[in-house]
A protein has these predicted regions:
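C-terminal binding/interaction regions
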Residues: 189
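A glycine/threonine-rich phosphate-anchoring loop and its flanking beta-alpha core
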Residues: 1-44
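Phosphate/ribose-recognition catalytic cores of enzymes acting on nucleotide-derived substrates
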Residues: 137-182
Length: 208
């Protein structure tokens, strides 16, 4: 069913604790990363609270445009999952208590972007720009989960298709794409190949 109306009440957000206000901003940062480079720039140059209504409208409008193009999530709509495959794994690792959804997605975005840069698919420096924006809004940029464990958890993600997972990566800020990876490709793509003792590799080491 499609919504007939989207209600936006920024005043309600003022009742949230700072941690959970920032949690929601992680999704706004995501939209800037995958679709709306001007929003990403504005989040860096201004305070989100100073243009809250415009920011929310921009995010809702971006989602509307993407969903209208791909209602069944068979193509372009997958872009909305940027950061979520590893983000869901981080949430599971923390037993849904250690990290909020936005915190986990933020780290997931960094891990995906770092892998994209490592493999020559993402413009160098993109990961650093995302990290700086997450830090500005006091969102974590690391987690204590071994990367190998996160990849194992990601292998059971609900978005898995057969023996592959569609990861969302960035060419640059505002320009995203889908990359299907087989489960066997994950360790090498994320830097956990046989030359690395990845049982001790932790997520934060891949985003420095």
């Amino acid at each position: 069913w499609q919504p007939r109306l989207v209600l936006i009440d920024p005043e309600l957000l003022s009742t949230l604790p700072p941690r959970f206000f920032a949690d929601g901003l992680a999704e706004a940062i995501k939209y800037g990363c995958i679709y709306d480079a001007p929003l990403f720039e504005r989040l860096g140059q201004e305070r989100a609270g100073d243009f809250l209504e415009e920011m929310i409208f921009s995010c809702v409008d971006s989602k509307r445009r993407i969903v209208e193009e791909d209602e069944r999530e068979s193509g372009r709509r997958m872009l909305l999952n940027f950061g979520h495959t590893l983000g869901h794994a981080i949430e599971k690792y923390g037993r849904f208590e250690g990290y909020s959804h936005g915190e986990a997605v933020g780290v997931g975005m960094l891990l995906a972007c770092a892998a994209g840069e490592r493999n020559g698919l993402t413009q160098p420096g993109t990961c650093g720009r995302i990290r700086s924006l997450l830090e500005k809004y006091r969102l974590p940029v690391a987690c204590d989960a071994p990367l190998s464990t996160l990849l194992q958890l990601a292998a059971n993600d609900k978005k898995r298709m057969g023996d592959s997972i569609h990861f969302i990566l960035l060419r640059k800020i505002g320009d995203s794409f889908t990359l299907p990876l087989s489960l066997n490709q994950l360790p090498s793509f994320f830097g956990c190949d046989k030359s690395v003792s990845y049982t001790h590799l932790r997520a934060h080491e891949t985003v420095l």
